[in-house]
UniProtKB/Swiss-Prot annotation:
Metabolic or biological pathway: Amine and polyamine biosynthesis; S-adenosylmethioninamine biosynthesis; S-adenosylmethioninamine from S-adenosyl-L-methionine: step 1/1
Keywords for the protein's UniProt record, in alphabetical order: Autocatalytic cleavage, Decarboxylase, Lyase, Polyamine biosynthesis, Pyruvate, S-adenosyl-L-methionine, Schiff base, Spermidine biosynthesis, Zymogen
Active-site residues (renumbered): S61 (schiff-base intermediate with substrate), H66 (proton acceptor), C81 (proton donor)
Protein name (database record): S-adenosylmethionine decarboxylase proenzyme
UniProt modification remark: Is synthesized initially as an inactive proenzyme. Formation of the active enzyme involves a self-maturation process in which the active site pyruvoyl group is generated from an internal serine residue via an autocatalytic post-translational modification. Two non-identical subunits are generated from the proenzyme in this reaction, and the pyruvate is formed at the N-terminus of the alpha chain, which is derived from the carboxyl end of the proenzyme.
Disulfide bonds: none
Residue numbers bearing the Pyruvic acid (Ser) modification: S61
Gene Ontology cellular component annotations, sorted alphabetically: cytosol
Record Gene3D superfamilies: 3.30.160.750, S-adenosylmethionine decarboxylase domain
Length: 122
């Protein structure tokens, strides 16, 4: 396995937190740490009149979050490579910190074409 790609839909979140760029930035830093990932770079952007996007470049891949405070919604991707990281823990932290009352998590296993072919043969 190359890694895990978690796709997280956060609904009914705290709209004030969703619109707070500093809070989103700190929360992404916390998520990368709890996942056991190494944060290389982090950029955020505050939109007018509302919304924040944050992108974290990890040594193991990335975390992205896009918020819509007016809808109480955030779209999150957490992709980590290798067996040592825990993207599901990052997702759980994001659910808790953004106070999501309802969420959906899909986890995809990422493999190389050779690994996929071998799995189909076996």
């Amino acid at each position: 396995m190359i890694g895990k790609h978690c796709i997280l839909e956060l609904c009914e979140c705290n709209s004030v937190k969703l619109d707070d760029e500093a809070f989103i930035r700190t929360t992404i830093q916390m998520a990368s740490k709890v996942a056991g990932a190494q944060l290389l770079n982090l950029i955020t952007h505050k939109f007018v009149p509302q919304g924040v996007t944050g992108l974290a470049l990890l040594a193991e891949s990335h975390i992205s979050i896009h918020t819509w405070p007016e809808s109480g919604y955030a779209a999150v991707d957490v992709f980590t490579c290798g067996d040592q990281t825990m993207p599901d823990k990052a997702c759980q932290l994001l659910v808790e910190e953004l106070q999501s009352k309802r969420h959906s998590l899909k986890t995809l296993r990422r493999d190389t074409p050779v690994m996929i072919s071998n799995a189909l043969i076996n």
